[in-house]
Amino acid sequence: FYKSLRFPIFVIRLQKCGLEGRHVLIRTNLFNKKCQRGGTSLRRGSASFYVYPAPRLPTLTTGKGGAGMSGKRVLAVYAALLLGFAVVLCRLYLLAQHPAYAARAAAQSTVTLQLPARRGNFYDAQGRLLTGLEERWQVVCFPGQGNYDRLYACTDAAGQALLYRSRSRAAPFLLEVSCDPARLGLTGYPAARRYAAVPLCQHLLGYLDSTGHGAAGLEKALDAVLSGTGEHSSLVCAVTAQGTLRTGETARLLQADSGALGVQLTISRPVQRAVEAVAASTMTSGCILVLDTATAAVRASVSVPCYDPERLADSLQAENSPFLNRALQSYAVGSVFKPVLAAAALEAGLQPVFECTGAVVVDGQIFRCAGGVPHGQVDLAAALEKSCNGYFIRLGQQLGAESLLDAAKAFGFGQSLPLAEGLAAEAGQLPAPQELAQSGQLANFSFGQGSLLAAPMQVAALFNTIAADGVYRSPYVLQATLDETTGQPVETLSHPRGRRVISAQNAALLRAMLVQVVQQGTAQDAAGLSGGAGGKTGTAQTGQFTPEGTERCNLWFAGFWPAEKPRYTIVVLQDGAVHTAYSGAAIFAQVCNVLEAAG
């Protein structure tokens, strides 16, 4: 009872003071006069006390006129204290059970790792991968030397540097590895490398930026389809304070469906790879296109030089412009344009014969045949075979500027060729009618020079029309979008309908003339192919010169194979060439050989 008072009370045995038994001492200055009754005064030094026998303790009050502290009040105090403790304990229990607080507490002992967002792949016409060819896995690395030793040999230089820096970090992290994690006793999550070490269909597909979105080519044009919502799957790891996985726990995968779709192209992977090998061994700058003659579907599209998708910044500084997709750029055309005039003449019922003296003078300007060599009496077939400039200048004069422009437009010149939304072959350039009112400009246009520009894809469409019995079809590369889980098409992409440009009979006549060009004319480097072939060479002046004064030229060959019932239309361009080891016709022949080998 007295322990509840706010002043010191001493319960002692007073034997030396002559007071036997147990007594209570209270200093006189700590309580009021009412407490003095029944007590004995006692002085020790400067302190005065009142002494009370323990059985007869008085009712004590504190302060002025304070009431006594009864036993009931003491019980009430104890009860209040117990109630307070009970309230605190209940509150702690409720906090521990509340989901939000429980989640916060759990979060302090879990680490969430975000896996790379899933991006749809590109597939070829037979459903074979064009991207994601190199298997890779994401594995969760926990602190410690053991993971460092196990994984160091399974990752590239960047991954090795990450491992070295993170050996002592107190948190798990993701690492890309090239070997199957199951062999190391680890769980891996597939994350194939987007592009192969040896590029495949590089310029057509394009590349990604640092955020994983398309920055060029089809990657950019189809970014919304390939990336979907962009949601990421993630791994939740319950970890200790040292960052290691808690005993009995495993990383928990939280799947996220981004809705990303794959895209199937018309490209044939074996044909593309084979044509890329031909280009790499025969040209330093240019492109090769291969079209399926019956449909105008693009089976291969190659542009050189290539760039390194892992070191894009280095390629930006290169003088040979490796980022250009030369199949879609426009160039000076040259003699591969002459079949347009031949087709217009056949449709007009014209097959004139002219005398070639090796040069033609128009408004005081001299236009020469190659080397200035006279060809004598030439008809349309011989003019194509010998690539006689003088003949086509006179034919252009006979047909007239309007007919030439109409024929060029019918074959797709001067118009962009869309391959996907935001991706198209350049429109190139046709001379304006008022420009062709000048006889010199009409002469230039008649054999593919002057202001005429065209993309290799447009030239491919021209020769494909001739090979396909006179029906023009715009080249295309998109076939369908795919559900990558089932491999089934989600949407079959629309293909352009054909339209007749010249009669089937005239197309057959023109094909026969182009076969003669290969067998006896300027394209004999392509002669001797199994099944024969037809085509046309072209050398276009660019007006650009080397420091030594040699003009750079665009060297073309466009044709079809085999000669009867053509299966493929092929265009070869070597741009800005000075000296080349292989002619366009020779490169064409190599492409035909690999097509035959591919079946």
Model feature map: region roles:
Residues T131, T250, D292-S335, A343-G576, ...:
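Beta-lactam-recognizing serine transpeptidase/beta-lactamase-like catalytic domain environment
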Residues C17, G38-S41, G45-S48:
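N-terminal amphipathic/hydrophobic targeting modules at extreme N-termini
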Residues L5, I9-I12, R22, I26-F31, ...:
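Periplasmic/cell-envelope proteins involved in peptidoglycan metabolism and beta-lactam response
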Residues S4, K16-C17, K34:
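Polybasic, lysine-rich low-complexity intrinsically disordered segments
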